[in-house]
Swiss-Prot record:
Belongs to the FliD family. This is Flagellar hook-associated protein 2. The gene is fliD. One of its GO terms (biological process) is cell adhesion. Keywords: Bacterial flagellum, Coiled coil, Secreted. Its main location: secreted. Homopentamer.
Length: 685
């Protein structure tokens, strides 16, 4: 032991040394520190053991909570006959057999678009153009630039629709195996893709419907469309419908009347047959759509057009080209050509001209050219249209090429959708998007998907294939007792793991005087008896005595719980309501008509366990907190005791050093006197 600078302690006395101090200190540490260390070790052991008990109680609480939950007793399972569908059912669904006839599955739209290519990196188009289509109540115009590859176009379609419509490059085989596919992500008739132009109606008129000739002898409703010869033709529509017809029935009748009228006209017969012109109902039959995938103009004419819900009676043509910027002010140089017709910019503009003056002069010059039309839009930019739907822009000389930028134009060729349709945008519908159609216990139902979860609450159906006539798929809904059985098995297992631990930690052997770590802790000693008191709970009913023994649960003479599954299953199947009342609880009314809930046995188990481990006021939580406080207090007491001993033996060492110094001085004096005596004696001799 080394304290301060007292390194020579004991040299004077040969007695007051560090060995003496260490022996004294060891004795004090055994008296003061050792008991605290032992208490701290016991505290740690108790905390570890308490964690184990709480963990075991939590394991017991899992199945107890399930068995004290009402939904466990109304759990259902389903069994499906046939391969037409799969089904799942939620808790509380009435026990029944559901017959489902599947006529059609919901499908997405699948289309081939354009020619085939040798590689996905092949150039799709040599001209600037726009792919136009309509789906899900929205019009899309996908810009396709000259030089874009097949893969680029596919990605542009997907990006423009945020993935609702997917451009896919599919390898189909052959010399040119790559084909652009345009498919919808989702199923249902409202996901159909209509290329080109379209008009849509929303019929709200519930009155009787008569389509014929008006007083002037004109058709009250007619379609004006581009025929197979490229010219516009008007086709009258005739129809009589009673007031009793629904909106859906009226739209279906109008659709049929329009199709028949077009099929009977030689200008449209083939166009209807090959799908270039189509008429469909959408939104569950509430809406009608007329589509020309060639992109031609569509017009609904006649006095009844608005009455039939056509708020817009003619398609609006898109402009072919809009300049990228307003035309530059001042004098412009060079010659440019539009469809081969030249414009001398130096002759059309002046140094003093504003941008607007230059624009007006150039528009006037363009409008004087054959087959071209130009105007200035609200942004002040140049807009050019061509009668043919095609526009070739060139700079005829070096100055003209440079001036194209000042006009907001680029050299190249631009085509409208209609002009590009027969070369770039030939489309073929391979699968038409449609709703699922099925009967549910005889009731006809349509849905946009094959996942059906809104017919009856809690019944979820996935349609997978159609059924044969008069051979419906049958969903058998029955009671599911498996959760009860599984939870009781878990309960038995958790109980049999908990009890031995409680016995070990609370035991006392009178012969050996050995006690468990929690032998004196009343709250822990009481756990087993509290659980066993609930286990022995019984109720007298009209059906006899209800107890856990009736359901196959028993305790042997060693306190080990067991479960007779056969007995349990028999009790569950014979009277499920009695099981629910005994396990979960039952409701009744008192004399005053007030609702009273009688707790079931597992609700009682749940309460016992909750009082032990749930929340800040739980018994074991309070005991755990007391152990934490004891641990902190013991740590503090040990620190104080160690500081006390340190101070005590520092002082003792200093005192020993002082005593030792005094003894050393006395020894020196004694030695001097002794020397003098010895010298005197020597002289006498």
């Amino acid at each position: 032991m080394a304290i301060g600078s007292l390194s020579s302690l004991g040299l004077g006395s040969k007695v007051l040394n560090y060995d003496v101090i260490d022996k004294l200190k060891d004795a004090d540490e055994k008296a003061l520190i050792a008991p605290l260390d032992k208490k701290m070790e016991q505290n740690v052991e108790k905390q570890k053991a308490l964690v184990e008990i709480k963990t075991l109680l939590s394991s017991l609480k899992g199945p107890v909570k399930t068995l004290s939950d009402y939904s466990t007793y109304i759990s259902r399972k389903s069994n499906v006959t046939g391969d037409a569908l799969s089904a799942s059912v939620g808790a509380g669904v009435p026990i029944q057999d559901i017959k489902v006839d599947v006529q059609n599955l919901a499908q997405g739209d699948i289309n081939e678009l354009g020619a085939k290519f040798s590689s996905r990196d092949d150039i799709f188009s040599q001209v600037d153009t726009t792919l136009k289509f309509y789906t899900q109540n929205k019009d899309y115009a996908v810009d396709i630039k000259a030089g874009m590859t097949l893969g680029d176009v596919a990605q542009s379609i997907t990006d423009a629709t945020n993935g609702e419509v997917m451009g896919i490059v599919m390898k189909t085989g052959g010399n040119d195996p790559y084909q652009l596919m345009v498919n919808t992500k989702n199923t249902g008739e409202d996901n159909r893709v209509y290329f080109g132009s379209h008009l849509q109606s929303t019929l709200t008129n519930k009155n009787a419907l008569s389509l014929g000739l008006d007083g002037a002898g004109k058709s009250e409703l007619s379609l004006n469309l581009k025929g197979a010869d490229g010219s516009m033709h008007e086709v009258p529509i005739m129809l009589e419908l009673p007031e009793s017809a629904s909106i859906k029935q009226k739209n279906a009748a109008i659709q049929k009347a329009m199709e028949q009228a077009l099929e009977n006209d030689p200008n449209f017969k083939d166009l209807i047959a090959n799908g270039d012109i189509s008429i469909d109902t959408l939104h569950g039959g509430e809406s009608l759509i007329i589509n020309d995938r060639r992109g031609g103009n569509i017009e609904v004419k006649g006095s009844k057009a608005k009455e039939l819900g056509f708020s817009q009676t003619t398609t609006q043509e898109s402009d072919l080209l809009k300049s990228a910027r307003t035309i530059k002010e001042g004098k412009l140089e060079g010659v440019v050509s539009l469809n081969g017709q030249k414009l001398d910019l130096s002759a059309l503009t002046k140094e003093s001209n504003t941008s607007e003056e230059n624009t007006d002069a150039i528009i006037q010059a363009i409008n004087a050219k054959e087959g071209l039309n130009a105007f200035k839009n609200a942004e002040g930019k140049l807009v050019i249209n061509s009668k043919t739907g095609m526009l070739t822009i060139k700079g005829e000389d070096a100055l003209g090429k440079a001036s194209l930028k000042d006009l907001g134009l680029s050299a190249g060729m631009v085509q409208s959708y209609e002009a590009s349709q027969d070369t770039l945008f030939m489309s073929k519908n391979l699968q038409k998007a449609s709703d699922s159609q099925f009967t549910y216990n005889g009731v006809s139902i349509t849905r946009p998907t094959n996942e059906v979860n809104d017919v009856i609450s809690g019944v979820n159906i996935t349609l997978e294939q159609t059924t044969e006539p008069n051979k419906p798929a049958i969903i058998s809904v029955s009671r599911d007792n498996q959760a009860i059985i599984d939870s009781l098995k878990e309960f038995v297992k958790a109980y049999n793991e908990l009890i031995p631990k409680l016995d070990e930690d609370t035991r006392y052997d009178a012969d050996t005087k050995i006690a468990g770590i929690f032998n004196g802790v009343g709250d822990i000693r009481a756990i087993r008896s509290s659980l066993n008191n609930v286990f022995s709970y019984s109720v007298h009913t009209d059906n006899g005595v209800e107890s856990l023994m009736k359901y196959g649960l028993s305790l042997d003479d060693k306190g080990v719980m067991s479960l007779d599954e056969a007995k349990l299953s028999s009790a569950l199947n014979s009277n499920p309501k009695a099981t629910q009342d005994f396990f979960y609880g039952s409701d009744s009314k008192d004399m005053g008509g007030r609702e009273i809930h009688q707790e079931g046995i597992f609700s009682k188990f749940n309460q016992v366990i909750a009082n032990l481990i749930d929340g800040g006021n739980a018994k074991l939580k309070i005991y755990e907190d007391s152990l934490d406080r004891d641990a902190k207090s013991l740590t503090k007491d040990k620190e104080n005791a160690q500081e006390l001993l340190k101070t005590r033996y520092n002082i003792m060492a200093e005192r020993f050093a002082a005593y030792d110094s005094q003894i050393s001085k006395a020894n020196q004096k004694f030695n001097s006197v002794q020397m003098m005596i010895d010298q005197a004696a020597a002289k006498k001799n």
